[in-house]
Amino acid sequence: MNWMHGLALLLAAALPSAAVADDAAPLAHPTLLSSPKQARIGEQRLRYRVSFDQLDLIGADGEPAASISAIGYMAERADTDTRPVLFAFNGGPGASSVLQVEGLGPLLRVRNGTRQTLVANPHSILDAADLVFLDPPGTGFSRAPADAAARARYWSDHGDAKAVAAMIRHWLKIHGRERAPLYIAGESYGGYRLALLAADIGDLRPAGVLLVSPLLDATSSDDSAGNDLRAVFDLPSLIVAAAAHGKGELAGQPVEQVYAQARAFALGDYAQALLQGSALPADARNRMAARLAALLGLPPQALLAADLRPDVETFRLGVLAADGQQIGRLDSRIVAPLPTPHADDNGRPSAANDPALGLGRSNRINSAVMADYLHGLFGAGLPQDYVSLDIDIAMAWRFAADDGAGPRPVGSAMRFNPTPNLARLAQANPRFRVLALNGYYDLAVPALGPWYALHHSGVDPARIDFRILPGGHAVFAEEALRPQLHTLLKDFLK
């Protein structure tokens, strides 16, 4: 399950940045290797093995302070120099790499009521590439940082990216894949992580990156006064959500048409109005409020009170409030009763009550089905619990900008953008490509934000394949999309 970038940014805004010291070399555990397995993908039968690798990350005292792990799926009897390797991770921060069982890997996690099982995935991309899923410190079976100093180092944007880069290098080396075509996938905050670590892996010459509902330019989610881009980027996805629930004048139209009209309005009349700020005349302000009300199904007075800049959380709690309902943030098609305030919320953000997330009152989700699966593959030497999601990690996360002089805090919020690092990878490899997959119904990372970041990154637009699909934040969780996604990825990995 994925965690949303908006919560991480919200929680981290008040936290000081911690400097990340030069890392001592991580300590590697021996590779664990499963017995041969078999998958059927389309008409192809494929034999593969599963590996588990772990690196101990070193603290300031020179002792192991945390760990990062990798679960690999490797086809047997393949040419290891020509067969691609795709590394993948989810986001959070605090999410394990559930892309492993949510569309990419040879097994799928399915739910039958409250019970979860793993079944064969006929649309796995294992037929085109070996797959390696990374679990950062505190997720999956990876050990959480042992003390405050280690948390400051490894639960930070730069420390986390360096740990992931170290694991990628380690895995390629010990598995003899340093000459293989390299691809990297990041979902949600994983997109931000990927753009950060791109600065450190140019020598590996990646052939491409897969970005799934990616946070990239933090401006797209920053609510700081004067940042109108956030409101412009959010609006098309808000209008799509309204239409999906029969609200607004675009209700009933195909989602592609709704989004196209909403995007044109957001980048046109709406952006022009917001850019005028307080100089926008009162009559023009009232007309814009009325136009927004017609598109969103909200009262004009509410939009005037929001200074014409509705935010995702207020919208998703308000658009169906008359019916006592909220809509999802990770998937705006989902509807649930409005949350009941609890005395023990302790500042817990409203986004943690997203019905599409499924946290309930807990901050942590352990995956019994993943723990049982991996224990069955590798024996009892692994930890008991597999941590699927821990939002306490997001609450402890530290963000910084790196201007070459080392990490430092950025004003009162996070308005920084590592996406231009991808242009460096493109310059190093003329075959480098970007595939970006986004969901129409994603309110955690509205699709216009990643589009803007990528088309201001310096990457040649001819190398960018940007798709918006009829899904939510977890694009690969959409069963109906998996055949199309498999075809897209096979072409991307050629």
Regions found by a protein language model. Give the residues of each.
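N-terminal cap/lid segment of alpha/beta-hydrolase-fold proteins
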Residues: 29-77
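Glycine-rich nucleophile elbow surrounding the catalytic serine of serine-hydrolase chemistry
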Residues: 186-198
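C-terminal subdomain of alpha/beta-hydrolase-fold enzymes, centered on the catalytic histidine
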Residues: 217-230, 298-494
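Alpha/beta-hydrolase fold nucleophile elbow
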Residues: 177-188
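A catalytic-pocket lid/entrance helix-loop region that shapes and gates access to the active site
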Residues: 109, 198, 202-297
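Bacterial N-terminal signal peptides
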Residues: 6-16
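Alpha/beta-hydrolase active-site loop
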Residues: 136, 154-172
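N-terminal cap/lid subdomain of alpha/beta-hydrolase-fold enzymes
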Residues: 22-23, 62-155
